[in-house]
Amino acid sequence: MELTELLLVVMLLLTARLTLSSPAPPACDLRVLSKLLRDSHVLHSRLSQCPEVHPLPTPVLLPAVDFSLGEWKTQMEETKAQDILGAVTLLLEGVMAARGQLGPTCLSSLLGQLSGQVRLLLGALQSLLGTQLPPQGRTTAHKDPNAIFLSFQHLLRGKVRFLMLVGGSTLCVRRAPPTTAVPSRTSLVLTLNELPNRTSGLLETNFTASARTTGSGLLKWQQGFRAKIPGLLNQTSRSLDQIPGYLNRIHELLNGTRGLFPGPSRRTLGAPDISSGTSDTGSLPPNLQPGYSPSPTHPPTGQYTLFPLPPTLPTPVVQLHPLLPDPSAPTPTPTSPLLNTSYTHSQNLSQEG
């Protein structure tokens, strides 16, 4: 949704800029005239690279581009405009007439490019001076192709340039469209209705509230987006805070404190496996010998305790009786479950023998 809102705001800004701006005619920009003059020089220089340039079979009529500056200043603006429009129109007709006399040659290609530049100049002047029918001016006949390119250059440097430098500012202000004032409060819905029908439905659905200006709407959107950033950061921090809890659970499961394992195995403590039925206590390691009391503070070498051991209590020393007692000896009285079990087992063996 944020991307859609951003695109709509950009569209509104572009629409407002196109509506409020008053584009001046191309002729009011002197860079256009400078570019046309540079391009005409480039075309004229390429003419010398053509292999064969012959005079035209039939002379063409070209406008008279020479003028007197003093006489030019005394003329009215309308007379100057009609004179320039007539000269450019005659030049375009002369270029097309000269090209029609040639076949597909290098000169014909250059004349085609020159006609495009003349059309561009004529369109720019008509947007500034109007499209009234210009009167016929003075003309001269020429057969030399170089005269066509030179006429265009002299026209740009002379009459057109002086027209724009002297009275161009007045003409540009007169021909510029009036600017429309922007109301202090503009509804976004009303502005969006002026857009094409494809986007009007989407814009009316997404935006039902009005804003004062398009700039304030963009500012509110940025503030709303910034307000969402702390919430995203809080969610991330909460997720990070849950990680230690999962680690503690895993640690407890591995240590066997959840009831999954009764305790550390003999392999964990380093004790070897003892097969069932083996009663040789001499082969047992020291930590499994009867009467061995491990130190809670100093475990044996190579062994580690996972949890602190409780305080050691005095362990009674248990003496094992032989499996086959002497029948003449008095029967001992068992004092513990372990002695009782060994005594019963010895009696069973003696009866079987």
From Swiss-Prot:
Annotated S-S bridges: 28-172, 50-106
Entry function: Lineage-specific cytokine affecting the proliferation and maturation of megakaryocytes from their committed progenitor cells. It acts at a late stage of megakaryocyte development. It may be the major physiological regulator of circulating platelets.
Domain notes from UniProt: Two-domain structure with an erythropoietin-like N-terminal and a Ser/Pro/Thr-rich C-terminal.
Bias type Pro residues, positions: 324-335
Protein family membership: Belongs to the EPO/TPO family.
GO biological process: cell population proliferation; cell surface receptor signaling pathway via STAT; megakaryocyte development; megakaryocyte differentiation; positive regulation of cell population proliferation; positive regulation of ERK1 and ERK2 cascade; positive regulation of hematopoietic stem cell proliferation; positive regulation of MAPK cascade
GO MF term set: cytokine activity; growth factor activity; hormone activity; signaling receptor binding
Compartments in which it is found: Secreted
Keyword terms: Cytokine, Disease variant, Disulfide bond, Glycoprotein, Hormone, Secreted, Signal
GO cellular component, as recorded: extracellular region; extracellular space
Originating gene: THPO
Record-linked InterPro entries: 4_helix_cytokine-like_core, EPO/TPO_CS, EPO_TPO, Thrombopoietin
UniProt keyword Ribonucleoprotein, yes or no: no
Principal localisation: secreted
Coiled coil: none
Assembly and binders: Interacts with MPL/TPOR.
Chain positions carrying an annotated carbohydrate: 22, 58, 131, 179-180, 184, 197, 206, 213, 234, 255, 265, 340, 348
Disease: Thrombocythemia 1: A myeloproliferative disorder characterized by excessive platelet production, resulting in increased numbers of circulating platelets. It can be associated with spontaneous hemorrhages and thrombotic episodes.
Signal peptide residues on this chain, from the entry's feature table: 1-21
Protein name: Thrombopoietin
